[in-house]
Structure formats: C-alpha cells, structure tokens
Amino acid sequence: MKRNEAHSPSRRRTRRSLATPALALLASTALPIAALAVDATISITGAWARPTLRGTRTGAAYMTLTNRGQATDRLLSLSTPIADRAELHEETMSGGVMSMKPVTDLMLRPGASVQIDPGHYHVMLIGLRSPLVAGESFSLSLTFEKAGAVVVTVPVTTMPPH
C-alpha cells in the first residue's frame, strides 16, 4: 500500500465506521467492570422480613452481616425503595420494659459476623409504601464506610430461612 492510500478519505471513513461500534462495545462493558472492582468484603446472608398487615406503616427485616475483609468496616446507612426510611435498631430490656433505639455506629471487625435477628438488632422499615406480603421480596441497600453499597434482596416470609 502506498503512503497516500493509507490517508485517503475512504480509508478514514472505514476507520471511523469501525471505531464507533468499538467505542460502543467498550462503553457497554465499563459498568460491569466497575462493579467487579468494588471491594466485596461484606457478605449478607439469611435476609428475610415478616409480612405486615394492611395499613401498617412499619416493618422489620433481618439478616446476618459478615466482614470478610482485612479491615474493620462501619455501617453508614440503609435505604430501600419500599419505605421512606430504613434504620438499624436495637431492642433492649430495662426494668422489665422492652424498648428500641436507633444504632448509629455498627462496626464490623475483620472476620466478625453480626446477627440482625428478632429480639436484638433489626432493620426498621419506616413509612412503608405498601404492606409486606408473604412471597414477595424487596431490595435493601446497606452502605458501608469501606465496602460501599451492598444490595440484598429480602424475601418476605413468615419464618426465617434455614
């Protein structure tokens, strides 16, 4: 090929027409590659929520959080599209009276697991937009200081998974 042929208008059009699909393909893989780069050190297992009655504006979800990383991580926030707010709460017994309070600083040491189960911690779903119905599920996002957002699908069931 002669030097002038390499820079001809038809060659430039061909290179440009091949470049557009190549760039589109590269762009379509950017999100999955970015998702793989996220530090997946927090595992969430055994998620479930109890069904609620019609008209009930609060619900609760349960699960186990495990830090598989090498550094302590901290739960910063929770969110879900099915409620106005999601908060981690702790139930405590004092003087024969059960009460609950928001937990604002849950730390997970390396290798540690935290049970979020009835009678202790629970994810309080405040301002439910519709009842939690057995057999359905919803997404819940837990954002950690180091691991970032971890999304879990929470099935609604009358009994915890085994």
Where are these predicted regions, by residue range?
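Compact, glycine-rich, soluble single-domain proteins
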Residues: 38-162
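Sec/Tat signal peptide C-region and signal peptidase I cleavage site
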Residues: 33-37
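N-terminal secretory signal peptides
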Residues: 1-13, 21-31
